[in-house]
Every structure is written in structure tokens, then in C-alpha cells.
């Protein structure tokens, strides 16, 4: 009990000293620097790193039994980035490809959502996608992501394209995946993939 009283007394004494010094009521003695009036330096705020993620999801018919798990995997990537420490300035965009309901003149690719920090909207758009036949032009999807997304101009920005599908990436008759990836790399964009299928497959 005496120890607690002593600790409390010391704490109150420290508080009183702190208040007394901060008011500057007493002038410092001659020749003694007025250290009480020195303003402590404030730590500089750490700039938030921009992270831009473009999701390219295969919505062709062959993904019918796989698309739900693909969406879950992609959303797990979004959550992992969003929960990083320190928290990044995260924006996510969405592209679908390989769906017969899309314009064939574009190579059956469509930008569903530009880069946005509204992750609720990303979730709604992602999980609303459905499958419907089609040709899977992976290179065209990567190219659309590079050309149509409003990528950050910040030199510190991390720019990523995630392609998720289950078919060979060689179906595009106009653009090869190598060409699409090289063009992305030239713009400091990293291209990653999630394969939806058996691990023993040649496409894995």
C-alpha cells in the first residue's frame, strides 16, 4: 500500500512539474538556457505507398465449375494487400475475358471497373460475374489492363495484374502472352497468374 502511495505521489509530482514548466511562469536563471521552451520535433508522417491491382478473370464456359473458387482466391489477394502493414493506398480494377456475351471485335474482353479504392464495389462487381462460352484471349486481357487502367504516376507505386483462368494462354491470334507481358513490364507493371485446374495440367 505504501509502495502504491509513493508511485502515485511521484506520478502527481511529475505531472505538476510538467504543468509548471509548460506554463513558463518562472523566468530561467541568468546564464541558464530556457530549455523548457524548446519545441520537440514532430516525426514526419510516412507517405502511404500506392498499390494498384488489376484483376483479369476468365468468365468462359469452362470456368463454370471453378469461378466461385477463383473469385474467393482473388478476393483473398485483395484482402491480403488491404491488410498489409503499413496500410497501402490500395486501388483495384476488374476485367473479364473469354465470355461470349462480350464484343468479339475486342477479343471478348471487357473492363468492368476502373481502378478504385471502393472495395465494396469491387466485391459486388467481382462476385456478380457469370460464365458463358467464349475464347480466352489472355494476352488481350493483359493488354487491356495496361492500356485502360488509370495507373498511378507515383514512382513508388506497386502496379500488378492478376490473371485468373483455366485454359492455355496461347489462344490469341494477334498478341502473344510474352508480348503482352513485356509491354506491361516496360510500364513497371508486374503480371501474375492464378491457375484454376489440376496441378498436373500442362497449363499449371
Predicted regions and their residues:
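VWA/integrin I-like adhesion module and closely mimicked acidic/polar interface patches used
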Residues: 167-204
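Sec-exported extracytoplasmic/periplasmic mature domains
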Residues: 71-86, 99, 124-131, 143-154, ...
Amino acid at each position: 500500500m505504501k509502495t502504491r502511495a509513493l508511485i502515485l505521489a511521484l506520478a502527481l509530482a511529475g505531472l505538476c512539474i510538467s504543468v509548471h514548466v509548460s506554463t513558463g511562469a518562472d523566468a530561467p536563471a541568468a546564464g541558464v538556457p530556457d530549455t523548457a521552451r524548446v519545441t520537440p520535433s514532430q516525426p514526419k508522417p510516412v507517405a502511404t505507398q500506392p498499390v494498384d491491382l488489376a484483376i483479369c478473370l476468365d468468365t468462359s464456359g469452362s470456368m463454370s465449375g471453378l469461378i466461385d473458387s477463383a473469385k474467393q482466391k482473388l478476393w483473398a489477394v485483395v484482402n491480403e494487400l488491404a491488410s498489409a502493414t503499413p496500410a497501402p493506398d490500395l486501388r483495384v480494377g476488374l476485367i473479364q475475358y473469354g465470355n461470349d456475351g462480350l464484343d468479339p471485335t475486342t477479343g471478348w474482353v471487357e473492363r468492368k471497373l476502373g481502378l478504385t479504392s471502393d472495395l465494396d464495389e469491387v466485391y459486388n462487381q467481382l462476385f456478380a460475374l457469370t460464365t458463358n462460352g467464349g475464347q480466352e484471349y489472355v494476352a488481350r486481357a493483359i493488354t487491356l489492363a495496361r492500356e485502360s487502367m488509370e495507373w498511378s504516376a507515383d514512382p513508388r507505386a506497386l502496379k500488378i495484374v492478376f490473371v485468373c483462368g483455366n485454359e492455355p494462354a496461347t489462344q490469341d491470334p494477334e498478341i502473344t502472352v510474352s508480348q503482352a507481358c513485356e509491354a506491361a513490364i516496360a510500364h513497371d507493371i508486374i503480371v501474375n497468374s492464378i491457375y484454376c485446374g489440376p496441378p498436373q495440367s500442362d497449363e499449371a
